[in-house]
Structure formats: structure tokens, C-alpha cells
């Protein structure tokens, strides 16, 4: 573990207390100052070795640790641990030294990160929903009193005791004109754990709050917060509330809180930005658990915000209608940790399950694969009192083809229309038409776009054959790439009111560019034999057919791309290649493409980065392939890069078992021809 400060060349592989001792052990690592680290601390003391304390950071994960979402932040302390005020800690030293060590650039990052946390309403754990409390009583202030569980090591470390909690509660109740709410851990109410305040709060007639609630939602509905050592107190400071500390948490003693105790090592005033910068930017370390790479605070904020946005939107009960057994294995992951999914084969039974809802309850939802959803299904579901949501592959899908049963890394789920359905507005189209991206959103989209271009990523990323020198073949003629599609695909039916075949597309491109060197690239699924869409060998229609090669490598050698509605048009567009559309894909109609068909609904002129922000960041759902957790676009790009590298060097293979080969033939013969 080089990050702990071991010199280069030293073996840093960890050994565990109880193993045969090694003479080259330089330090002992344990989990904070909790009982589980007692043996490690004792071992360090007996052998005269430094003890290094590890703990979860202040911005941990989407859900609780018990729900198995991995942590993204950790603190490493060589002196003590942040919640033990009985001795110095690295964090305390960082705060003390803040005026001399924190440059303006670091404080600017702190201010921006604070604003991001407020905007995305993020906390250490981010599973709690927004809730509305009853209105305040007239002429009364509302104080929040935060209880803690009895086994919380920060209580003793924060120089507190059970009497401290009781004194805190009694002090709050003695304030005239005050409505006292006590935040009690749900496990305490259920009798699974012990707290400090439950019985006393009941005796004093306080209002008990045991339901999970987003801290930011809670802060908006109280006037002040009293804590002993809970991190909730620091988050209340971030929300601008007055905070009274009855113990000595890491943020007390710096002039930010009303303190009932003192720590002689503290006492110098520090700003909120200084304490935040020390705790979240200097003291904490971050890693993306899905890429297994170090990360910045800003990257973790964005990842958590994306996870929370997707999980919140998709929370609740679902019926998955007519999904194949293969898709059933992974569809549930894309609905997030707060969803419940039941699969149903028969539409009649799914519709019967849509029982009438109470007034104000959200409609029950049916999920269907868009390409297999009959036109009448939406009306049937609506009449039964439900909502139909449709699902399709996302735009950064996989290393390997969907027709070869390669699991996707991204899908899109839409309750309005699919992005390829030009007859009505999808959620993506509405976002592009009505949302005004911020400078931050556009900058993020630009970074993502530039990374995709530099890595040469596309939707499938499976082919890597060397391309010929097209400029030499074209001999100074304009090079036009015509991208074929699967003619039975739902996107052709819904987004192409005019020409609908690859042959007609080639003829239209040749008519517009009679002197050009026309290259035809059929769809990978057609080349693989899995789908229908071959063209005739009409002389003069095209000059070269390229069935192999990564399409992203083609973009550097062509002058223009023609497509019906292929995603390849979007991939070319973000690389600066002029694109002519003969259908109405999601990226047409925004002033970025040469469109042969108009869409009156699309009235804005967008930048490429605004299009990327909607299509690659906001619209899709991304899932980590190893854990099945929600993730985000940047994470999936790194995973795709890693998988493609493994494919190239032979450590990952895309084998085609006999079942897949049989499926290809079956699909080409029966499914792909409707």
C-alpha cells in the first residue's frame, strides 16, 4: 500500500495479526480506534511499531455499507483518528495549519465542492428519500436533536457519555418557544440497537423522527441542530444552520459551532471552507470502486450524484413484460437498488396485476423491450391504470455485439418514447429542447467527448482490423461513408418516414455525391449473420465495402457520413465529421447535421457538447459489469477501455458457443425478417 507512505522498494503486501511475524513489518494498519482494531493496536504497541488508522471517509456510498454498495472514500491517519479528540489526529493538524498550507486554489475547490454537495443533496450515505415534515407550530422554532447508537466509538472519542446526551436533550427542551424533534436511529426504535435518548425523549414529550430522510431535506425544515459528535452536525453547517456541539467532533472548537466542551489543542477560528478543505480534500482519499482507480472528490461527487439520480428515478415496483431469459439475468441491475422487479411472460396477466391506485400514488409500471413492444401496448397499459416504460440499448454498450448475447453496460429507459421514435418526443428530446446546460455540464460533456475520441470508442468496440489507406484508394476524390443498418430494427420503422433500406440509402448518397468515393459499411450484426440488411451488388452504387475494422478509425479518413438513423452518425458528429441524415435520429434537427427530413418539434440550435450532455450523461443508465451497481458514463468509458485492452492482448476472449451460433441463425431466419 504505497499510499500509506512506505519507501519505494519496500514490500508493502499486508500481513495480518495472527500470521507468522515478519521482520520487515514497518507499520500496523487497523480500522480506526474501534474494538475491531484492538488487537492491531496492541500488536503495534508491543512491537514498537507505528499504528495507522483507516476509516470510511465523509462521503462514502449510495447506500449503507450493510446494503453492499462499496465505499468510495477512506481516511488514513498516522497520529490518531478524526473522531477521537482525546489525542491529536492528522485532520486536527491539517485544520490547525490551514492558514499556512491551504492555497487559494484549494479553497476554491472547497467552495465549488460544497456547492455541488448542496446542489446534489449528497451526504455520507445517500439512500434516504426526501420527506415533508408536518408544518411548524405558529411562533415556534424547531430544533433537531441527534441521537447516536450506543456502540458509536465517536461518543467516547468525542469526550462524551450517556449523560452528555441527556443534558443536550434537557437543554433543548428548556428553551421557550421551541419544538424539539429527536432524530433516533431506526434500529433503536425497532429494538435492534441501543441509543441514548429514546426513553427520555418520550418522557419529555418530544417528537421522535425515526424514518430515513435526506439530511438536506431535514435541514430545510428545522431552525437549528444539536449534536454530540454526529457527522450530521457538520452537514448542517454546510447547509447554513446553527449547530450546538455537546461533544468534541472534528468540526468543533474552530469557532463554527456553539460548543459545550473545549479542546486545548484547538481554539483558533477557522472558516467552513478551511475545515471542509482539510477534511474532504486533504485528509480523505477517494477511489472509484468500479474502475479500481484513484479519484478526486469532484469525480466521486459526480459519480454519487449520477447513481442517486438514476436510482431515485427508477425506484419502486416494476413488471418486466416478455423479456427473454438472457435479459432477465441483468435487467434488474439497471433499475437500481431501490426497485423491485417481477417478470411476467403473458401481457394479459401483467395488465391484470395493474390494480387501481390510491389517489396520489404513482402509477404502477410495466417495462418492455422497445423493439418488441407492439404499437397498441401503451394504450392497453394506460387503460389498465399503469405506465409503460420502454428499454433499449444505450449508446456506449459493450465490447462485443448484442446479437452475440454480450451483456450491455448501458441501457436507456423511457416512459415517453424511445429516442429513435421520431413520431413523438422522447425524454431525451425533451431534455435537449428545454434544458439549458450549465457551464459545468458542458465542460463535463467536453471532457467525456474528448476522452471517447482519444480512446477511439464506439457503441460495440469489438473490431480492430487494420484499415486500408482510403485516401490512396480514393485518389483525391471526396470520401463518403454510408453506414448500413439492420433493416428490421425498430429504429428504421420509427425514425425513417422516407427511405428504409440500405440499398436506397446508398442510391441517395450516390445521387448527392456522384463523383465521390463511396464506402459502404454494413452493420456488424448483419456481417455476423445475425440480422438482415444485405445490399445488392449494383455497379456504381459504391466503390468499397468495409465489413471489418473499428468504425471510429474510419472517421479520421472520411469527408462525410450518410446514414438513415444510425448511432454512427452521432459518433461521427462528435468527431467533427459532417453528417447527412435521411431519417430522424435523436441527433438530427438541432442544427448540427444536414437533414433530408425536418422535425418541427426540434426548434433549438445546440452545441455538440450540449448534445453529448443529454445523450451520454443524462439519458442512459450505466451499470458496472462485475458488481451490477449503477455507475456513470466516465466509469463505463474506463471499463470499456480496459475490456478492449484485455481483448487485444488476449486476456479476454469473446468466444461464440454453439448456442450463440445457433441463435444467430435462428434470428436471421425468423426474428429479423418481420
Map each language-model feature to its residues.
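Catalytic-core helical/loop segments in enzymes performing group transfer/polymerization on anionic/lipid-linked
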Residues: 1-674
Amino acid at each position: 500500500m504505497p499510499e500509506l507512505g512506505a519507501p519505494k522498494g519496500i514490500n508493502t503486501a499486508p500481513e495480518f495479526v495472527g500470521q507468522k511475524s515478519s521482520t520487515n513489518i514497518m507499520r500496523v494498519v487497523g480500522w480506526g480506534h474501534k474494538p475491531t482494531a484492538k488487537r492491531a493496536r496492541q500488536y503495534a504497541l508491543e512491537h514498537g511499531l507505528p499504528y495507522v488508522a483507516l476509516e470510511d471517509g465523509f462521503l462514502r456510498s449510495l447506500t449503507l455499507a450493510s446494503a453492499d454498495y462499496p465505499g468510495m472514500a477512506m481516511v488514513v491517519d498516522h497520529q490518531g483518528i478524526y473522531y477521537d479528540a482525546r489525542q491529536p489526529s492528522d485532520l486536527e493538524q491539517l485544520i490547525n495549519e490551514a492558514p499556512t498550507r491551504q492555497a487559494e486554489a484549494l479553497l476554491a475547490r472547497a467552495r465549488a465542492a460544497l456547492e455541488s454537495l448542496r446542489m446534489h443533496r449528497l451526504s455520507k450515505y445517500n439512500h434516504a428519500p426526501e420527506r415533508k415534515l408536518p408544518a411548524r407550530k405558529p411562533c415556534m422554532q424547531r430544533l433537531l436533536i441527534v441521537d447516536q447508537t450506543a456502540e458509536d466509538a465517536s461518543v467516547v472519542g468525542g469526550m462524551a457519555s450517556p449523560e452528555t446526551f441527556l443534558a443536550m436533550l434537557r437543554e433543548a427542551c428548556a428553551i421557550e418557544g421551541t419544538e424539539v424533534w429527536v432524530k433516533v436511529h431506526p434500529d433503536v426504535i425497532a429494538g435492534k440497537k441501543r441509543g441514548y435518548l429514546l426513553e427520555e425523549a418520550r418522557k419529555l414529550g418530544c417528537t421522535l423522527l425515526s424514518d430515513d430522510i435526506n439530511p438536506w431535506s431535514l435541514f430545510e425544515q428545522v431552525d437549528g441542530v444539536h449534536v454530540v459528535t454526529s457527522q450530521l452536525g457538520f452537514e448542517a453547517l454546510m447547509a447554513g444552520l446553527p449547530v450546538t456541539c455537546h461533544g468534541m467532533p472534528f468540526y468543533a472548537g474552530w469557532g463554527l459551532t456553539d460548543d459545550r466542551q473545549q479542546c486545548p489543542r484547538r481554539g483558533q477560528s477557522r472558516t467552513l471552507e478551511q475545515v471542509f478543505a482539510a477534511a474532504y480534500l486533504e485528509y480523505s482519499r477517494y477511489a472509484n470502486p468500479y474502475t479500481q482507480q484513484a479519484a478526486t472528490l469532484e469525480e466521486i461527487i459526480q459519480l454519487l450524484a449520477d447513481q442517486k439520480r438514476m436510482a431515485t428515478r427508477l425506484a419502486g415496483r416494476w413488471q418486466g413484460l416478455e423479456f427473454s431469459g438472457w435479459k432477465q439475468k441483468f435487467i434488474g441491475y439497471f433499475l437500481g437498488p431501490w426497485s423491485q422487479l417481477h417478470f411476467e411472460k403473458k401481457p394479459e396477466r401483467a395488465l391484470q396485476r395493474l390494480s387501481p391506485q390510491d389517489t396520489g400514488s404513482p402509477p404502477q409500471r410495466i417495462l418492455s423491450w422497445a423493439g418488441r413492444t407492439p404499437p397498441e401496448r401503451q394504450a392497453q397499459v394506460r387503460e389498465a391504470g399503469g405506465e409503460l416504460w420502454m428499454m433499449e440499448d444505450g449508446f456506449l454498450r459493450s465490447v462485443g455485439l448484442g446479437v452475440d448475447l454480450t451483456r450491455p453496460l448501458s441501457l436507456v429507459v423511457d416512459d415517453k418514447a424511445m429516442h429513435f421514435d421520431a413520431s413523438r418526443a422522447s425524454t431525451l428530446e425533451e431534455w435537449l429542447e428545454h434544458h439549458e446546460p450549465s457551464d459545468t455540464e458542458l465542460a463535463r460533456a467536453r471532457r467525456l467527448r474528448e476522452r471517447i475520441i482519444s480512446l477511439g470508442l464506439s457503441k460495440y468496440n469489438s473490431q480492430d482490423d487494420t484499415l486500408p489507406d482510403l485516401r490512396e484508394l480514393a485518389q483525391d476524390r471526396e470520401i463518403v461513408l454510408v453506414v448500413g443498418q439492420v433493416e428490421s430494427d425498430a429504429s428504421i420503422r420509427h425514425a425513417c418516414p422516407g427511405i428504409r433500406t440500405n440499398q436506397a440509402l446508398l442510391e441517395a448518397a450516390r445521387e448527392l455525391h456522384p463523383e465521390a468515393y463511396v464506402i459502404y459499411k454494413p452493420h456488424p450484426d448483419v456481417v455476423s449473420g445475425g440480422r438482415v440488411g444485405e445490399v445488392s451488388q449494383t455497379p456504381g452504387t459504391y466503390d468499397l465495402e468495409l465489413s471489418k475494422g473499428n468504425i471510429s478509425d474510419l472517421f479520421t479518413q472520411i469527408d462525410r457520413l450518410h446514414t438513415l438513423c444510425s448511432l454512427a452518425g452521432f459518433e461521427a458528429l462528435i468527431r467533427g465529421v459532417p453528417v447527412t441524415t435521411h431519417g430522424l435520429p435523436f441527433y438530427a434537427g438541432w442544427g448540427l447535421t444536414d437533414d433530408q427530413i425536418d422535425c418541427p418539434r426540434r426548434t433549438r440550435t445546440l452545441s455538440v457538447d450540449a448534445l453529448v450532455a443529454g445523450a451520454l450523461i443524462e439519458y442512459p443508465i450505466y451499470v458496472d459489469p462485475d458488481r451490477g451497481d449503477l455507475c456513470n458514463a466516465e466509469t463505463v468509458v474506463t471499463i470499456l477501455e480496459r475490456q478492449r485492452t484485455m481483448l487485444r492482448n488476449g486476456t479476454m476472449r469473446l468466444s461464440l458457443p454453439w448456442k450463440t451460433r445457433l441463435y444467430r441463425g435462428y434470428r436471421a431466419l425468423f426474428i429479423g425478417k418481420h
